[in-house]
């Protein structure tokens, strides 16, 4: 505000792959991250199908699940779990069991790294924070896999593309955003 009062035009260029900034249509890097996560899910289809496995693909998104949602839909995940909607392990298993009964043989679960089980989400805020901080699992994918083992003997594998979602070459959409914004940037 102070700069604009001095006659300087100021704009903000959002730099987060999470696409979680209010007032923006799309943040820089979001679509590239979605493409990488989608490719991961797509590549896993073959091995999941040929070995009748449950694959849990953990995707970036600690507080919001936009990358997981878009990649899960585009990549053809069978179950998508987001931080905004606490999951019920019974419902996750029922979706897997239905696929088994329908002779699908495999299931791909796309889960955002910030997804939490319903029973944790229902705790009072202080207890919820403690439960999350004291979680013995290295990540949500491992917790989910361990919980699903109580329901099934089907082989469960985990794939975590991790920081590859933040790196690499930007896709055409993100390159367009970069080039469109170029005249507004100063060195």
Task: For each feature predicted by the language model, list its residue ranges.
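Short, ordered loop/turn segments at secondary-structure junctions
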Residues: 8, 13-20, 84-87, 113-116, ...
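Acidic/polar active-site rim loop that often engages polyanionic ligands
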Residues: 13-26, 49-50, 74-75
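Single conserved hydrophobic/aromatic residue that forms the stacking wall/gate
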Residues: 178-187
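A contiguous binding-surface segment within folded domains or other stable secondary-structure elements
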Residues: 154-160
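Accessory alpha-helical/coil subdomains and C-terminal extensions
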Residues: 9, 30-51, 58-154
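Short beta-alpha connecting loops at secondary-structure transitions
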Residues: 19-25, 127-132, 168-171
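N-terminal glycine-rich phosphate/adenylate-binding segment common to multiple enzyme folds
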Residues: 1-7
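Short glycine/threonine-rich loop-to-helix capping motif typified by GTGT followed
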Residues: 121-124, 168-176
